Amino acid sequence: MPVAKLIQKTKSGVKPTTLALATILLVACAGGVEPPKPADLGPNVSLLGVKLAWTSQTGPVTFPLLAKAAGTTVAVAGGDGLVALLDARTGQDIWRTQIGNPVSAGVGSDGRYVAVITQANDVVTLEAGREIWRQKMPASSFTAPLVAGARVFVLSADRSVTAFDAASGRRLWAQSRPGEPLVLRQAGLLVAVGDTLVAGLSGRLVGMNPANGSSRWEVPIAVPRGTNDVERLVDLVANVNRQDDQLCVRAYQAAVGCVNTGRGTSLWVKPANGAQGLSGDDRFVYGTEIDGKVLAWKRVDGERAWESDRLKYRGLTAPLAVGRSIAIGDNTGTVHLLSREDGSPLNRLTTDGSAVVAAPLLVGETLVVVTRNGGIFGFRPE
């Protein structure tokens, strides 16, 4: 049964709790009703030539991983504290190191600096495989640090944003604001768009000055509604799609929307029931819903372009638009390549049989996939 991993904010920090996504699921579970089973996909139709180029390994991934590409490198981490920077062309280590503490969020990288957050609430930054500093945070974090502009930015579970000097670890500024008492135990939204730091704070997209954290603009994507904390939970999730100044994002189980970050204005918002982030191209924005539907919205106005229920109940990741396809991982370790035009199948790729834990990532010409068991797989066009 799918569950929402939630964190409850308290005066002394945050504490974890696990709550069902919907009362009906709790009732169904109590009544012994089996969850829906995915339909058989039938034989693979290989209409797009892709081959496995290399494999690597990290520790089992027990946290909300976001692998990070920078140039021809990809930064990854395992839950046990292993952090590695790989050459995405060959899969070979550039370096790997053990930081000595389990990881709760990562990875952030600009190709030079790599940053993760530990379960002890430490921000740890490495350079050339060597730890150069760590700083204690006042609250947990489940969002990968953002490394940009010689700074390391951290979005914490108490919805505070903190900036550090990437080389020295000196704290530059911190901004916090009141929010709802529950937050997701899932990677949130923290990205750079030009000279603006963009963060998801509750259901609002906030553009900040990276020099001091002051707010430049705010755009609501979802508004808290309901009579209890669970119903009022709104958070923006990781994996966004950017085209020039347009940033398209998802509010957990509430909406998808696109914002003009240059003007700080909403372009459109549409209701949607998904938990994973988005991808897109110049025509469409792509996403997966809680039940496994794959949807495409028209970028210009948010109207539905197509939907596919072929992958329902397969525990899908966020999609990645790559070439003429979109790539989506599932909970069996399969990567599905679907047509951007209508969602029809183009190919299926296999990994190690454990769930794909992060949206597939394109690094140069290599499609990088990471699984729950710590398998790292590089695929290339044939």
What are the language-model segments listed below?
Residues 32-68, 95-111, 132-148, 171-194, ...:
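Extracytoplasmic beta-rich repeat domains
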Residues 26-28:
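C-terminal motif of bacterial Sec signal peptides marking the signal peptidase cleavage site
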Residues 351-382:
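Blade-level signature of beta-propeller repeat domains, shared across WD40, Kelch, NHL, RCC1
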Residues 288-296, 303-337:
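Loop/turn-rich, solvent-exposed surfaces of beta-rich toroidal or solenoidal domains
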Residues 87-90, 127-130, 165-168, 210-212, ...:
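Short loop/turn segments that connect beta-strands within beta-propeller blades
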Residues 78-79, 118-119, 156-157, 200-202, ...:
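Structural signature of WD-repeat beta-propellers
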